[in-house]
Design a protein with these regions (language model features):
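N-terminal periplasmic/intermembrane-space "pro-region" immediately following the signal or transit peptide
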Residues: 10-104, 419
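Outer-membrane beta-barrel pore domains
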Residues: 113, 158-163, 171-174, 190-191, ...
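Outer membrane beta-barrel
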Residues: 85-241, 254-259, 263-270, 333-339, ...
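Short helix-to-loop capping/linker segments positioned immediately adjacent to catalytic or ligand/cofactor-binding
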Residues: 203-206, 220, 246-250, 264, ...
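Active-site-proximal beta-alpha loop/turn segments in soluble metabolic enzymes
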Residues: 234-249, 281-283
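A general secondary-structure boundary signal
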Residues: 20, 30-45, 127, 137-141, ...
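Bacterial N-terminal signal peptides
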Residues: 1-7
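A generic structural micro-feature
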Residues: 93, 118, 152, 208, ...
Length: 419
């Protein structure tokens, strides 16, 4: 631009003074044009800087966030987080209710006159356990029972227990009376036991043994080295107005029953248990018919499964407070079982012999005389279900004669399971 302006000026050939003024004016004009060009060139850069400065606050964090998200934690930090999560998971939470169920379905057919063969629904049992603190726990057992016209719900056990240590545990509630072995080893839930039913002397709803007990119980181990001694001692309500039931709502007299059980589990002979029990109560049948009751029992058990050996003996003494008349009843059973080594050890044949005698002088019980042989087979369908089949040969004494008559043969089948 400067060269063009100068060429134009020199082509006009004005006077010298005028030429100097024109050159000065042209130079000033060129200087103004250069400033203008510089300003115009500076505007896009300023606009881009302004735009970048406006958008930078919102856009800048994105790469940082992405970088932080993609950046892995150090190994020791990850291990620390995992350890903390594991500790939180392992920490106990109270209360922590757990529920387990048992059920069974049965079939029976006998040659006893006046009875019908067919299926029946066994007990539906729920076990509920909850820790309330590191040393306090609660346990409940409820059953749903089928009857000809309806169902009944029974609270079989309801126990709150405080564990001071292994040598002393105290509890209150409704128990299975710790007499002998079977009554506290196998509770409601037929899957728990080898056979279909309990022995007659400890059957649910029976009268020979007080199955349930309402009151207080202390139990624990006894320091005895390898002998493995343990005890349980309880005080509570005895038999109720219906002697097959305890005094759930209160005792029917002012005399408390007590029970004591002592047994050993030698460490060197795992599966072996032997011991004895004693029970004392006052039975009130109404009308001034009160009786002192003494029960003593002993048991010898081997539970390794190959073989299984269960045996119990129980003696019941009743003395009339009014007349002093005494009656003595006896009962025992022996059960043998062997888990076969074939078919993944799922087959277990067993045999049980039962004997029960009540004298004619016995007025607390009805006639309970019994001699029974049971041949059975248990097949464990899975770890939580079993199929059982039994043949029973039963003889009961007829009241009019001193000999055992009333022989009954029967086939019994059951499928039982836990869930």
């Amino acid at each position: 631009m400067l060269a063009l302006a100068a060429g134009a000026a020199w082509g006009q050939s004005p006077p010298a003074s005028d030429q100097a003024e024109q050159v000065k004016a042209l130079l000033e004009r060129v200087e103004q044009l250069e400033k203008r060009v510089a300003e115009l060139e500076a505007r896009p850069a300023a606009a881009s800087i302004t735009t970048a400065s406006v958008t930078a606050p919102s856009a800048a964090p994105k790469p940082e966030v992405q970088e932080e998200a993609a950046k892995p934690e150090p190994t020791h930090q990850m291990e620390g987080h995992m350890d903390q999560a594991a500790v939180r998971q392992m920490e106990p939470h109270y209360p922590n209710l757990q529920i387990r169920g048992f059920a069974d379905a049965d079939f029976s057919a006998t040659d006893q006159k006046g009875t019908n063969s067919g299926f029946n629904l066994g007990q539906l049992t729920l076990h509920m356990a909850s820790a309330l603190s590191p040393k306090i726990s609660y346990f409940a057992e409820m059953t749903f029972n089928a009857h000809p016209t309806n169902y009944t719900v029974e609270v079989e056990r309801s126990i709150i227990r405080y564990d001071y240590n292994d040598y002393f545990k105290i509890s209150f509630g409704r128990y299975h009376t710790p007499i002998g072995y079977w009554n506290t080893a196998f509770h409601h839930g037929a899957w728990l036991q080898t056979s279909i039913d309990r022995p007659e002397m400890v059957k649910f709803g029976g009268t020979f043994t007080p199955i349930h007990f309402v009151g207080f119980l202390a139990e624990g181990n006894i320091p005895s080295g390898g002998l493995g001694l343990a005890y349980s001692v309880g005080v509570g309500n005895g038999r109720g107005d219906i002697i097959s039931r305890p005094g759930d709502a209160g005792d029917n007299n002012n005399n408390r029953a007590w029970v004591a059980n002592l047994y050993a589990r030698p460490q060197r002979l795992y599966g072996l248990q032997f011991g004895g029990s004693a029970y004392r109560d006052k039975i009130s049948l109404g009308g001034g018919n009160d009786y002192r009751e003494w029960i003593s029992s002993a048991h010898l058990i081997w539970t390794r499964g190959a073989p299984e050996f269960l045996s119990e003996y129980e003696h019941v003494n009743h003395e009339s407070i009014l007349t002093g008349k005494v009656s003595n009843s006896d009962s025992y059973y022996v059960q043998l079982g062997y888990r076969m080594p074939w078919v993944e050890r799922t087959l277990k044949p067993y045999y049980r012999f039962e004997y029960m005698h009540t004298p004619r002088s016995e007025v607390v019980f009805t006639n309970l005389d019994l001699v029974e042989s049971i041949f059975g087979l248990r097949y464990d369908i899975s770890s939580y279900a079993a199929f059982k089949a039994e043949y029973r040969h039963t003889s009961r004494q007829v009241l009019a004669t001193p000999t055992f008559e009333g022989i009954v043969n029967g086939l019994f089948v059951q499928t039982s399971f836990t869930f």
